[in-house]
Amino acid sequence: MDLYTFDSPEGIPESKYIPLDIMSDYSIGESIARIPELVRKAKSLNMKALALTDRTLSGAIEFYLLCKTNDIKPIIGQKIAFGNNEVNLLCKDLEAYKILCRHSLELQDANDFPMALSELRITKEDCEHFICITSYCTSELLTSFGDNLYRQVDFADVKNHPEKFDNLDTSHAVITNPVRYLEKEDYAALAAFKQSISENPSPTYPDNYFADDSEIIPFLTENNHLELAENTQRITEQIQFIFPENYFTTPEAHNRMRESLPDFEDAENQLRAIAVEGFEQKLNEFDNEQEAWDRLAYELEDIGNHHWEKVFLFHHEVTSWCRQNGIEVGPGRGSAPGSFVSYLLGITNVNPLKHGLVYERFLNSERLCYPDFDIDYDYERLPEVAEHLKEKYGEDFVVRIATYGRLKCWQTLEIAAKYLNYSAEEILPIKKIILDFCLPRVTFSRLLDSSSYLYKDVIPHWDGVKLQGFLRDKKNEKLVKIAQTLEFVKHNIGLYASGYIVTGDSIYTYIPVLKDSKTGWIYSEYTMNILEDVGLYKSDLLGLWELTKLKQLTEAISKKTGTPFNYKEIPLEDKETLEAFAKGKTTDVFQFEAPGMKKFLKKLEPDRFSDLVLMNALYRPGPFDYIPIAIDNKAAGNYRNDFPGCESILEETYGLPIYQEQIIQMAQILAGYSLAEGDMLRRAMGKKKLEVLMAKKAEFMERAPVTEIVSEKQAEEIFDIMIPFAGYAFNKSHAVAYTMMAYWEMYMKVHFPKEYRKIIKNFREELEEEDF
């Protein structure tokens, strides 16, 4: 999450008024004020505190961290419907936040179907942890909150009706100006947004902007009720809500993550026993048994040192259950296939020793990281996997993750045009230019900048002239203003497609949650990035159609041959399969069916599995330009060696460092880095920050002579050559695993063409005759 530090104001006295009724765009359809804008505004006004009172706690952590970064006291609150009344509950302390988390589902129901405070099971003892602000101080609220109850005096209301000050007990009253948008002129933008999402939108009020001292203090002074602003300060002083020190630092978040995972009895010994059993079962696969044993011991020690055993055991249980129930599991994804322990546990199906994969690319003791397993499952049976987790651990222990859709510029243009009664003929041509020639995420700042690369290199000249003319036309000024104001505003909430949070205790003890009315799944109010800060473990369950295809092919082939067929036992050096790749006959073969890929395969003439892995890694933006060089080097049989001592690790890529793992290993060979240090060097090279690169370069040059392979001068030259490769280098672990699936498919296509053709028809209607 980006934590911006906004400019501090100069010459502005500290604000006397603190806004205590603010809704952000996390309250979808009720507010268009984004949290960064709210905090920036508060800082510009020299406010030392700020409240957030959304319908949920979805924005609480983002708000808290951004306020803290800008030296503003964050006041976390929630707006809740009680009967016919609405209240703002402000958290006085951390316990109040935990209470809201525990009751989050009930509070969701309360906002949908208002109920009495007693029905929410919030006790009088709970109420002691809150400040309650409401327009209607009922006897129930007074009994529950006592001195923590304040009457809300609406600034716009008393400004228009000063007589409402008469007989007002101001000792427990505060002035508020509910904030639903930032500036006065943003009123139209909120009205337009409401109209776009509802046929019967709720009213939009012209006074719900971010008011400040310049308006409120003179008015209260004139009416002899300055104490209403002073009470906002008084409430602020009562707020002692703070997360523990270092709570959001990575080490602390990881400690909480370890503690929050489901428990496994004697996890360290259990992991070791399962890994050793897997080792013994796969013993005949290892060319060097001692090397394999040393790798196992090293990984187990590292996993144990960082106490990540439960993560491995969790994924071992899931993948084992899938195999027992006939659900296909992918060979691996991302950097996980680089772990030998993952392979022995059956989490992945790639032998990292055979393919030269590096464990430190997955888990690195030099940087703070956790075992992030992304696992593919049979697409059609993915729901069964999720249901298994829910049944095994409980629905309060396995929950989905929220994701928020944000408005893009072309969407906001449509919204503004509809609100201002533009015709379709006026707006559709402009929308078409944006969608045809610009990325969907293009921003207004780019569109309004006539010197932008969009108008030089992307949008055709006359279309650019038309677009610029429309956006700068005086008569469209209001439309553009509304559209710009709505850009990036949250407009819907959904479920993150693959992410699941798994905990050992009820999720309510950690975070606030909601319930999806369509699926019945409980899901976190926080997004994925926030959950990592909070310290909860995310497991990705990814559905992959290729695994569905492989399952169906396996069943068809087994039926034909009369014997069980296991595609995972297919030899990776089958001559006919490699020849089919070399001829470019890859239609309907996973990751290899693009026309350009077919062309390069014919030129490369792959004759080993590693050639296919290489092409898979190269055929993507960035390393694409190295394809002709790799082809020429393979054809020549010899090539220039820019990296002395690294011949053995670069042989499979014909002298080019194409894989991230190769960069790591080269640092070890040339400069004596550990593999963990080599991974840190690779990451630094990839980010291309000049000051970091210069420091790493000096370090590399200093360490290189120790290996006696290159001199300090040679090390400088080699470092400069490595930098562009490191920026484009691809994760070999991922390339090997996904190429393996492609190879399995091609093998079945070559050796069982009728069965392959029949199954493929289920996935697409038209087949190319010449490709079979």
Where are these predicted regions, by residue range?
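Alpha-helical scaffold/interaction cores of sigma-54-like transcription cofactors
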Residues: D2-F772
